[in-house]
């Protein structure tokens, strides 16, 4: 859909010329008779996925000012999004009392995510201001939110199991999806160009989706992946001396460094983390359930709400609402402090994939350390997530995620996982976010009889120019104890393309002999393998068959081919790292 985003630098400069009033855009037919207003409209719409729709939307706007035109486009997108939200609500009303529990659940969820989309779009419009050339460092955050607005709409569709209902909702929300896609294109090209030109940035590679200049030759960490219940160890890159990603704020880095197992953290012990709430099953804290502590955290919090969860098995489903931002929860160890629940699409009445998750994080700035998250539905439950993270800039260290199908749902935003364990069978690391998972043990389990295993399933349908995809770096992929005797007969693949532009990069990772030589699997009934982006680089182990992979996946031969997928680049912008004021390696 957004393949057209990758346009030439010359075209970008022409568009920027319109945006800053330096030159006038002449369309490709050389029509100099266009009015100044239509020249500006044509310039703004040049790189959009649906140019006709873009021009039709902006044609009535009586202005040639790109700021006013783009603001008008965003307001029109909001109007269409409101119509889509109303449509999903009215669909539920029209179905009346005969509606099935699952359809009611999914339409209720649709109403919720459309509300989130409208809230975020309103925030984007407010943050845009009157002069987009002054948007500065906010541009990357706004682009991320805008991608989220699109993802919320597809969340609704992805959760619908009934074909007729999915078709009806898909047709009803089609216009808002088209306008949102065009808005992302405009931000990715025109607005980004305006901001960069104003800041006198002469490097336009990031606006064209090109791969950044290669860094130094890769340095591979050959040491074993750490156990999340064991001592901490250093990451490959984008890490300061405390082992915390440098794009995390200074205060949060100090907090994560302090928070060891229990309230006393630090490698030497003795450093006390000042918590807001303590959860304990034995009543020694303020609350006995995790949800009670989450509910007690303030909404729209500028600081951190810190929850210490004492050792215990907490059998509950925890929902962190969108307004409960900046929550940090930590426990006594990934096997000692565990949140567990049993909810699945196949076995639980009125459940969707999104609603199956044991922990559901809708808010931004979520952090977790020394925690376990589990869904006990089993392979017969089908989709059954241990955690679903929707919020941007999530940081999760030393945690464990156990399930079968769809264990770790990295659904939206930018997410960073380090030193974790993830277990599952089918698509057990999946979503539509920009996610980097480093130094993590990936455990493939034995599923139902005759079932194959797929580690990843990325859901990028916006285009290869977007930072949406899953990156595994310096991980280990191994079978669990029950699968080990059958690991050579049960087919296990690195992943399969869930959406058209599915993006997955696996580098510097050890692969056991359970991985099939072909590596990747086609999504049955779809042709997404023809347009996806699957890349392997510098992997090792008996499962790393570089010369026997499917011909639609790529085995990279140089650092230049994967440098754009490092934590610093994939989870950018780079100023997040620079503002941390610590040494950082940009490349591999």
Curated annotation (Swiss-Prot):
Predominant localisation class: secreted
EC numbers: 3.1.1.11
Catalytic activity, reaction form: [(1->4)-alpha-D-galacturonosyl methyl ester](n) + n H2O = [(1->4)-alpha-D-galacturonosyl](n) + n methanol + n H(+)
Family matches, as PROSITE patterns: PECTINESTERASE_2
Keyword Secreted: yes
Pathway: Glycan metabolism; pectin degradation; 2-dehydro-3-deoxy-D-gluconate from pectin: step 1/5
Signal peptide residues on this chain, from the entry's feature table: 1-24
Alphabetized Pfam families for the sequence: Pectinesterase, PMEI
Keyword Electron transport: no
BP GO terms, sorted: cell wall modification; pectin catabolic process
Tissue: Expressed in pollen grains and pollen tubes.
Residues reported in the UniProt entry to bind substrate: 353, 383, 496, 498
SMART domains tied to this protein: PMEI
Active site: 406, 427
Cell location: Secreted, Cell wall
Glycosylation site list: 86, 206, 342
Keyword terms: Aspartyl esterase, Cell wall, Cell wall biogenesis/degradation, Glycoprotein, Hydrolase, Secreted, Signal
GO molecular function: enzyme inhibitor activity; pectinesterase activity
Xref: InterPro entries: Invertase/methylesterase_inhib, Pectin_lyas_fold, Pectin_lyase_fold/virulence, Pectinesterase_Asp_AS, Pectinesterase_cat, Pectinesterase_inhib_dom
Domain of life assignment: Eukaryota
One cellular-component annotation, GO: plasmodesma
Site feature: Transition state stabilizer: 405
Note: The PMEI region may act as an autoinhibitory domain and prevent untimely PME activity during transport.
Protein family: In the N-terminal section; belongs to the PMEI family. In the C-terminal section; belongs to the pectinesterase family.
Functional summary from the UniProt entry: Acts in the modification of cell walls via demethylesterification of cell wall pectin. Plays an important role in growth of pollen tubes in female floral tissues, possibly via enhancing the interaction between the pollen tube and female floral tissues by modification of the cell walls.
Designated name of the protein: Pectinesterase 4
């Amino acid at each position: 859909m957004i393949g057209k985003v990758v346009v030439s630098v010359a075209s970008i400069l022409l568009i920027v010329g319109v945006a800053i009033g330096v030159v006038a855009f002449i369309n490709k037919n050389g029509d100099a008779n266009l009015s100044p207003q239509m020249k500006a409209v044509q310039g703004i719409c040049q790189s959009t996925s649906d140019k006709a729709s873009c021009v039709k939307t902006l044609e009535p706007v009586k202005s040639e000012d790109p700021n006013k035109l783009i603001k008008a486009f965003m307001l029109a997108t909001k109007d269409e999004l409101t119509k889509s939200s109303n449509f999903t609500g009215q669909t539920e009303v029209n179905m009346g009392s005969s509606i099935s529990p699952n359809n009611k659940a999914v339409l209720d969820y649709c109403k919720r995510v459309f509300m989130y989309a409208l809230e975020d779009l309103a925030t984007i419009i407010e943050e845009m201001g009157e002069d987009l050339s002054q948007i500065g460092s906010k541009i990357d955050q706004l682009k991320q939110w805008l991608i989220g607005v699109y993802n919320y709409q597809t969340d609704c569709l992805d959760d619908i199991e009934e074909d007729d209902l999915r078709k009806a909702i898909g047709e009803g929300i089609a216009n808002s999806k088209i306008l949102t896609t065009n808005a992302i294109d405009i931000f990715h090209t025109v607005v980004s160009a305006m901001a960069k030109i104003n800041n006198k940035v002469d490097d336009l590679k990031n606006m064209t989706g090109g791969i950044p200049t290669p860094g130094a030759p890769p340095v591979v960490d050959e040491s074993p992946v750490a156990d999340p219940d064991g001592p901490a160890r250093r990451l490959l890159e984008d890490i300061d001396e405390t082992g915390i990603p440098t794009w995390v704020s200074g205060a949060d880095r100090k907090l994560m460094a302090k928070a060891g197992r229990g309230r006393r953290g630090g490698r030497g012990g003795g450093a006390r983390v000042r918590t807001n709430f303590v959860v304990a099953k034995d009543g020694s804290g303020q609350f006995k359930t995790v949800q009670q502590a989450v509910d007690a955290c303030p909404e729209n919090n500028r600081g951190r709400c810190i929850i210490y969860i004492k050792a215990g098995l907490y059998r509950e489903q925890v929902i962190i609402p969108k307004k409960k931002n900046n929550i940090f929860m930590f426990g006594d160890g990934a096997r000692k402090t565990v949140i567990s629940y049993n909810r699945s699409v196949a076995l639980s009445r009125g459940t969707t994939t999104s609603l199956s998750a044991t922990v559901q994080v809708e808010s931004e700035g979520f952090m977790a350390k020394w925690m376990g998250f589990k869904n006990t539905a089993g392979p017969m439950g089908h989709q059954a997530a241990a955690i679903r993270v929707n919020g941007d800039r999530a940081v999760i260290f030393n945690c464990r995620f156990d399930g079968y199908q769809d264990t770790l749902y990295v659904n939206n935003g930018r997410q960073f996982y380090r030193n974790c364990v993830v277990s599952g069978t089918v698509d057990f690391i999946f979503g539509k976010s920009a996610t980097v998972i480093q130094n993590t043990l990936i455990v493939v389990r034995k599923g139902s009889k005759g079932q194959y295993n797929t580690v990843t399933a990325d859901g990028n349908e916006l285009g290869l120019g977007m930072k949406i995809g899953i990156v595994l770096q310096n991980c280990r992929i191994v079978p669990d104890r029950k699968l080990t005797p059958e690991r050579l007969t049960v087919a296990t693949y690195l992943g399969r393309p869930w959406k058209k532009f599915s993006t997955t990069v696996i580098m510097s990772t050890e692969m056991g002999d359970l991985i099939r030589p072909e590596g990747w699997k086609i999504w049955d009934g779809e042709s997404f393998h023809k347009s996806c982006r699957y890349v392997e680089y510098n992997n090792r182990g008996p499962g790393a068959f570089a010369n026997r992979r499917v011909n639609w996946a790529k085995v990279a031969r140089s650092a230049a081919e994967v440098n754009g997928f490092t934590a610093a680049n994939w989870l950018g912008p780079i100023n997040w790292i620079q503002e941390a004021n610590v040494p950082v390696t940009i490349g591999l």
